């Protein structure tokens, strides 16, 4: 059964792993990048960084392994590998249905850690770009998830107060960003939605 969203004026969707199942393609791209630049690859750790732009993930790799990789060079290689993927991921049914059910009555936005060009191309390739009233990417903000900037800008662009918005996310970083923005959040899991109201934030994070 789908959740009800009467209390909200705006619905904000993360993209990778929430609306579109891109994680396998991202994992494969990072594996090739790790092989190319010679660092250990841990898919579970990578998933914990979901929502973080590629160049910042490289900084985390440097910090974790004591390396001095060039974030621009390495993230550029990774993004090229992802762009060359034949299958980037299909729409995730439960969140896609929420989008379809609510886009005529609510304001809907994307709030993603992906760069603008890649995000726009992916959304267009899946036929959903034009459904959104706003698309906020890593290109438009300086402070990325878990900071609230992505979701606050999305709320501003759809002309809703943060308290009027609910976020759909699949990672802890995204949940933290939603709560930092003063927004309720639905986590997308393999078994469905898990509601995480902002009132729980102080006790769980």
State where each predicted segment sits.
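Structured helix-beta-strand junction loops
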Residues: 52, 104-105
